[in-house]
Amino acid sequence: MSSLEPATTAKVALITTKGPIEIELWAKEVPNITRVFIQNCLDKKYIGTTFNKVIKDYLVQTSKIKEPATLKLKDEFHSRLKFNKRGLVGAVHDDKRNSNNVDSLFITLKPTPEFNNNYVLFGKIMGDSIYNVVKINESELKSEETPMYPAEITDIKILVQYFDDLVESKEHIAEPAKKKAKKAKKPRVKLDYTLEDEEDTGFKMKSAHDLLSDSKLSNKLYANKKKGPSENNEKQKTIEKAQDSSMETKKIVPERPDYKGSEEIENETKITSSENMNHETKQDKPNYKAKLDRNPNIDSDYDSDLDLSSSESIDLFAFKQSNFQSS
């Protein structure tokens, strides 16, 4: 320390991706600017900012904090504080008098006498942490003053506060995480397989054969028959009555001179009934008509596809009973 340079009274540490940077502050000589700077450190405002401006072998500068201050600070130049070596920390301004702020700060890498009485000097880098500043200054650049991968401030530690009345701002105090209200769980249905097995032991499956031979079931069916006629019984009786009436009709023969006897009529009736059955069977079957090829040399001139289903027909019995006179 120069014999003319006053002693520092406060101290903070900026933790960066290139290593820690320890800064000692002249809080007594530059009270207003150092007070705001320490308050920003208490509120962790510099966390997340980067050294986005790098001028080789000259200086490095941080980006602005997320919530810049609207209050402009007055110039606090001190006759014993000069930019006469590397590792000095200064406040930025708006290129005019009494417009200083510590939303961003810079660190020199060489003596910069041109900054005297132009920028406010309020701190200096201590110990070996100056080499971490050199690492930041040696970063690869993607443009004239912009680094390819800028170093970032990840944490801040207050080592010597000096201003005892400073506390962390309430709006920056992290609120404890609120516990989420537990949702009422729906009661789960517990399946008791033991009880189900016990209930199933009294149930026995029976086959269809066993059911038919079951005496209880047969008694029920027999009881149902006794209660009254079912629909099937009524149909059976109707069929029997129809058969009896048809038999009586067969026996009745009109008195005609050409009567041939009951046996002959019965045979003819059987033939007629068989023909009727064949006719009904043919009607039940699907009517597939195959197209026939006619030979004009041997086949007669007729329409083989002619539909005669709607023509009048006469059975054999009626044919026998009718008299046809020749004209």
UniProtKB/Swiss-Prot annotation:
Cell compartments where the protein resides: Cytoplasm; Nucleus
Family annotation (InterPro entries): Cyclophilin-like_dom_sf, Cyclophilin-type_PPIase_dom, Cyclophilin_A-like
CC annotations in GO: catalytic step 2 spliceosome; cytoplasm
EC number in record: 5.2.1.8
PROSITE patterns tied to this protein: CSA_PPIASE_2
Region (Disordered): 223-307
A GO BP annotation: RNA splicing
Tagged with keyword Isomerase: yes
Source taxon at top rank: Eukaryota
UniProt keyword annotation of Nucleus present: yes
Catalytic activity: [protein]-peptidylproline (omega=180) = [protein]-peptidylproline (omega=0)
Main localization category: cytoplasm
PPIase cyclophilin-type domain: residues covered: 8-158
Molecular function terms from GO: peptidyl-prolyl cis-trans isomerase activity
A UniProt-annotated Pfam family: Pro_isomerase
Function comment: PPIases accelerate the folding of proteins. It catalyzes the cis-trans isomerization of proline imidic peptide bonds in oligopeptides. Involved in pre-mRNA splicing.
PANTHER family: PEPTIDYL-PROLYL CIS-TRANS ISOMERASE-RELATED (PTHR45625), SPLICEOSOME-ASSOCIATED PROTEIN CWC27 HOMOLOG (PTHR45625:SF6)
Subunit organization: Associated with the spliceosome.
Protein name (record): Peptidyl-prolyl isomerase CWC27
